[in-house]
Amino acid sequence: LGVAGVVGNGLKNNHSSYGRTQASILAADIIDRMRANRREAESIGAPYDIVLVDPSPTGTSIAEQDLNAWRTTLASTLPLGTGAISMNAATKKVTVTVQWDDSRGTGGHSIQTFVMETRL
């Protein structure tokens, strides 16, 4: 019985670790996309800015396509996965937030948040 408990805890911890790893990878992915599209990312209107509750964009600009693909990947990789991006135009500081439900890893409904900050 004790071994079963240890194995169960190990599985929960592995699932939580997997979520954090995926969040980190996906945050880095959108930052790489922004750097590849630096001219549009730094343009007036902040085309990459998106809040957690915003729907995914459906337009044809590179920024809109990047955000749509990123949000789709978040939703398919992480339970209830979503993300937000904000950029300070003056400092070029980008904050990427990834949020998901880690209830499998924590044993109850638990929204986890991963934040990555960098400069373009």
Question: What is each stretch, according to the model?
Answer:
Residues 8:
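Short, conserved catalytic or interaction motifs in soluble domains
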Residues 1-5:
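Alpha-helical hydrophobic helix detector
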Residues 11-21, 25-120:
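Flexible, low-complexity segments enriched in proline/glycine/serine and punctuated by aromatic residues
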